[in-house]
Design a protein with these regions (language model features):
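Structural signature of outer-membrane beta-barrel channels/translocons
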Residues: 36-38, 79-83, 117-121, 148-150, ...
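Long, well-ordered mid-to-C-terminal structural blocks that present hydrophobic/aromatic surfaces
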Residues: 25-100
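Outer-membrane beta-barrel "beta-signal"
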Residues: 176-189
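Repeated loop/turn-to-beta-strand initiation elements of outer-membrane beta-barrel proteins
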Residues: 42-46, 84-89, 122-127, 153-159
């Protein structure tokens, strides 16, 4: 498989003395497993774990601007169906097993998400509300709302809102001054 997020490797120096970077999507091997258990009463408990052998991370201190490390990703989640709403609580953990000085990714990256997805008005209105954060919440959080409305069979309207909080050096906090509002319309055929 290939990494979805690029690693930036140093390609060389341009004539005007700027460093030239190349986006790379390195290959890696991955093994993993998942388990989901129906706990009854509309509750599902799920878990996943994955091991990546050569995960590449941008590192300006290394030759060609990148390092590699084995990485483990794990997830524990609980889903609850309440009428027309699917409520999910999820804890994810990502850990570089051979973290090196200069890597632009933290050795350990936890992520907590709480989401609710629902349908209303005979499935014409769909809502998704999300709170995502890396502890502590005041340092790194995202509030997101996604709404789609289909007033007639051939028209789909959308509204998405992202509000970021936190410190500039954190995953969501780096966008704290760039909240987003997106409006869309689509013709369905």
């Amino acid at each position: 498989a290939r990494q979805q997020d690029p690693v930036y490797a140093v390609e060389g120096i341009a004539d005007d003395q700027r460093v030239v970077l190349e986006r790379q999507f390195p290959r890696y091997s991955m093994g993993g497993a998942g388990l989901a258990i129906d706990a009854g009463h509309s509750i599902v408990v799920r878990s996943e774990v994955a091991y990546f052998d050569r995960w590449h991370v941008t590192n300006p201190y290394r030759n060609h601007g990148s390092s590699q490390s084995p990485m483990v990703k794990s997830l524990l989640g609980v889903d609850y169906l309440l009428r027309n709403w699917l409520i999910s609580v999820q804890w994810q953990e990502q850990q570089l097993l051979d973290w090196q000085q200069g890597m632009v990714q933290d050795k350990r990256e936890p992520l907590f998400t709480l989401s609710a997805e629902g349908t209303h008005l005979r499935d014409r209105l769909k809502s998704r509300l999300v709170l995502a954060m890396s502890p502590p919440a005041k340092d790194d959080a995202l509030l997101q709302g996604i709404f789609t409305y289909t007033p007639v069979d051939w028209l789909k309207l959308g509204l998405e809102v992202d509000v970021f909080f936190g410190k500039e050096d954190r995953t969501f906090g780096q966008y704290s001054q760039r909240d987003q509002l997106r409006v869309s319309a689509g013709y369905l055929f």
